[in-house]
């Protein structure tokens, strides 16, 4: 009987210890969630997030090494509509005869997806990033004009004889991919579809 009682007591003590550990871990998790909630989900204004980060002493670095106004996981979710609307307007402002043989080129799938979403998939978008590289190849068949974004002018001049600054700039204080210019590129120096294999950018 003694060993039965002792064993029962040990089992009860283990259950209490496990319960205490679970309660402690849950409490730590809840506290951590409450603290990090404003800086992990885009539900507050950027100014609030920035003030909150400073009040708790948090600092974040952007992928390009710059210290951001807000954390990059927030910054990368902002201003997509504004970016897409600028690209769409630039495309729609082309003459009708040119528009039918034009497309928008961007460097990553986030930009490409935003343009497709906010244009209701009415604007042809080309990107070499991930699956868009596959989807874009067929679109290159008849493209003569590109509204290009995400690289410097001299990069586009390697592929096009005429590269014009459109005067449209994606100005944003959030994220590292903003503050670049849209260029209108015409007169390709070679068949774009033939060089597309070299542009593959899978990550």
Language model: regions and residue ranges:
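Signature aromatic-anchored transmembrane alpha helix within multi-pass, membrane-resident enzymes
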Residues: 12-53
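Hydrophobic membrane-spanning alpha-helices of multi-pass integral membrane proteins
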Residues: 1-5, 26-28
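Aromatic/acidic, Gly/Pro-rich catalytic loop(s) in extracytoplasmic/lumenal soluble domains
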Residues: 82-86, 91-95, 120-203
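Short periplasmic/luminal acceptor-recognition loop of GT-C membrane glycosyltransferases, typified by
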Residues: 37-42, 46, 51-133
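Transmembrane alpha-helical segments
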Residues: 3-15
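Alpha-helix N-cap/helix-start and coil->helix boundary motif
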Residues: 4, 111-112, 153-154
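Short basic/hydrophobic patches in alpha-helices and adjacent helix-turn junctions
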Residues: 13, 114-117, 151
């Amino acid at each position: 009987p003694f060993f039965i009682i002792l064993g029962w007591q040990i089992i009860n003590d283990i259950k209490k210890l496990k319960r205490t550990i679970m309660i402690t871990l849950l409490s730590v998790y809840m506290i951590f969630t409450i603290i990090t909630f404003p800086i992990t989900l885009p539900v507050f204004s950027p100014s609030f997030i920035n003030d909150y980060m400073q009040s708790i002493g948090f600092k974040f670095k952007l992928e390009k090494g710059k210290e951001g106004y807000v954390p990059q996981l927030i910054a990368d979710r902002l201003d997509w509509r504004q970016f897409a609307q600028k690209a769409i307007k630039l495309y729609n402002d082309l003459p009708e005869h040119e528009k039918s043989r034009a497309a928008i080129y961007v460097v990553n799938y986030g930009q490409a997806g935003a343009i497709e979403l906010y244009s209701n998939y009415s604007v042809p978008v080309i990107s070499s990033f991930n699956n868009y590289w596959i989807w874009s190849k067929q679109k290159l068949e008849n493209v003569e004009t590109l509204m290009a974004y995400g690289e410097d002018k001299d990069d586009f001049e390697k592929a096009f004889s005429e590269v014009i600054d459109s005067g449209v700039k994606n100005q944003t204080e959030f994220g590292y991919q903003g503050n670049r210019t849209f260029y209108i590129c015409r007169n390709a120096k070679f068949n774009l579809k033939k060089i597309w294999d070299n542009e593959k950018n899978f990550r």
